[in-house]
Design a protein with these regions (language model features):
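Short glycine-rich His-centered loop
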Residues: 2-32
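Short, solvent-exposed turn/loop segments enriched in Gly/Ser/Thr/Pro and often Arg
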Residues: 61-63
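Alpha-helical cap/lid subdomain in secreted, periplasmic
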Residues: 3-6, 36-56, 65-224
Length: 225
């Protein structure tokens, strides 16, 4: 059963996979604010199927963020929005920089720092919201021995552990991607194994909605019963 009460505020935060061309100048939950990815699809389905709930969806994803960059703006981007629920998907850039960053001398995020920072954010947020939703970072790479995929799995496991400690709903996006990749190539979903196209975003949105109890049989008239 969908847990979100009427007029709930749901903030989504993360990196470019959450951001996806959102208009930073738009008012929260206004035109252009949702981006072109899974957040927009979640918003559209919740609005169409649960019009009686009048849910406010806010996209606070920022392209390029790792967990430290996201944490630096947490108060402004998340807590100041007074959310009832917070959904987080972070980690792919924390991993990716280990592979594309050495010649740029970027500041890398270790697994321990990732866990410590994630734990701090969830610990600060849990008492102020009705619910937390933690989404796994993911990579559209079926070979689990691929070095980057293997590291993504380790960071995703940390995210799962943090979610468990804080009673958060855990959305295993990687598992959904792995199931798809048993049937089709990663190039159906992404050109770089990390940034989904619209098909990939639909898979992310569907996985998120299933995890939170979206009723796929509900009609737009059920609120009249």
């Amino acid at each position: 059963m969908l847990p979100f009460e009427k007029n709930s505020r749901i903030v989504f935060c993360g990196d470019s996979v959450t951001d996806v061309n959102r208009d930073y100048t738009a008012v929260p939950a206004g035109w252009g604010s949702f981006g072109d990815g899974y957040v927009n699809l979640v918003h559209a389905l919740l609005t169409a199927v649960y019009p009686d709930r009048e849910l406010m969806i806010m996209n606070e994803g920022v392209g390029g963020d790792d967990i430290k960059l996201m944490a630096a703006r947490w108060d402004r981007d998340v807590l100041d929005m007074k959310p009832d629920y917070v959904s987080v998907m972070i980690g792919i850039n924390d991993v990716w920089r280990h592979f594309d960053g050495p010649f740029r001398q970027v500041d890398l995020v270790s697994l321990d720092e990732f866990e410590h920072t994630y734990e701090d954010l969830m610990g600060r947020t849990e008492p102020r919201v009705k619910g937390l939703i933690v989404m796994s970072p993911f990579m559209m790479e079926p070979n689990r021995d691929d070095p980057m995929r293997a590291m993504v799995d380790r960071y995703a496991e940390v995210a799962r552990q943090v979610a468990d400690r804080h009673g958060a709903t855990y959305v295993d996006v990687q598992a959904a991607m792995d199931h798809f990749l048993k049937k089709q190539s990663s190039y159906i979903l992404s050109m770089d194994r990390c940034h989904p196209g619209i098909e990939g975003h639909m898979l992310v949105a569907r996985t998120w909605l299933q995890a939170v109890g979206f009723d796929w049989e509900r009609t737009t008239f059920d609120d009249e019963k």
